[in-house]
Amino acid sequence: MATGPRYKVPFRRRREGRTNYHLRLKLLLSGQDRVVVRKSARNVQIQLLAPTPEGDITYSSAVSSELAKYGYTGATGNTTAAYLTGLLFGLKSLQKGYEGGILDIGLQASSAGSRVYAALKGIVDSGFEIPCSSDVFPSDERIRGEHIAEYREESSDLPEQFEATKEKIFAEFS
């Protein structure tokens, strides 16, 4: 790997594709808590983290698999689930007394209308303060899952299920 004195081996977490240290430093210097959104094929995870010298402390978190408690039976890795998870996270965080933070998407590509920004829209709609532009949010039709209901018979009730789950989440935290 390193073949001479001029070769610099990147940090391990950078080599693994897990940490962007330049972005992390900027986020830490901002002095605000970080709202970390991570997505996989099956889930969306959101955490509110605060940096300490010993390591980051998690204040609040939500995972899209928690939506089953609110009657959501759709896929947990799609845009609809990302929005609902963001909504759940925002209301949980507000209930615990946290009011805002700054978005950390890590090494994920920043694409307008993506699941990351669907989760961000859910967080913002809950009343949690995150500085952002509304230009990056997906359309309301995509958030409700109408694009899935059009072509997939099993998910034809997804928009109704979305509204019912959203009402249950608001009912629990009001």
Curated annotation (Swiss-Prot):
It comes from the Archaea. One of its GO terms (cellular component) is cytosolic large ribosomal subunit. The keyword Ribonucleoprotein applies. The keyword rRNA-binding applies. Keywords: Ribonucleoprotein, Ribosomal protein, RNA-binding, rRNA-binding. Part of the 50S ribosomal subunit. Contacts the 5S and 23S rRNAs. This is Large ribosomal subunit protein uL18. It comes from Methanosarcina mazei (strain ATCC BAA-159 / DSM 3647 / Goe1 / Go1 / JCM 11833 / OCM 88) (Methanosarcina frisia). The gene is rpl18.
